Amino acid sequence: MKKIAVILSGCGSRDGSEIHEATLSLLAIDMNGLEYQCFAPNKNQTEVVNHFTQAQEQENRNMLVEGARIARGNIKPIDEINASDFDALWIPGGLGAAKNLCSYFYDGANMKVLPEVETAIKSFHKAGKPVVALCIAPVIVAKVLGANVTSGKDAGTASKIEAMGGKNTVCNYDEIAYDAEKRVISAPCYMLDASISQVWLGIKKAADKLKEIL
């Protein structure tokens, strides 16, 4: 069975992995007869946000510990990812991708990528293995690989992707961008004002495309 490494960035749309996107990703991977293993950096999030009030909280939360909520405890530190053990890499969105896995939320096109995340992306790419990124996470792949990705219809994000050396493809909620040369698949998800069922259509299409090219 083909195996997919999934990188989480916490638990929650405002400061970690977007829970709908992460859960639907695992469902889509599983429905395609693929196996997954979740990973996350064993580091504190840059912020903790109260998802009810939207206020920033004065506390620390660990990405690995928080990601374990989504993974039902079956999660490993990101430095244990070995591209030779997996067939593809998958990164759900959520502001944790833009705050914790990289500094895009704070620095825009001048962002830095967490070294462990950059190493993982480069190792899969070097091995010729696909990378899937959802929502805001494609900015990371654009920065690291200069890939053609989608930010939905967000012109501001698109311009920053291009400033970082990537290319942007405008997509609706039920569409994906596929960079055949770099083997990168991306879907806009909640970069659009979409319902959970609409987000599912894009994620399922990304998973279907992944299975097709594996």
Q: Where do the language-model regions lie?
A:
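Active-site-adjacent pocket-lining segments in enzyme domains
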Residues: 5-31, 35-37, 74-214
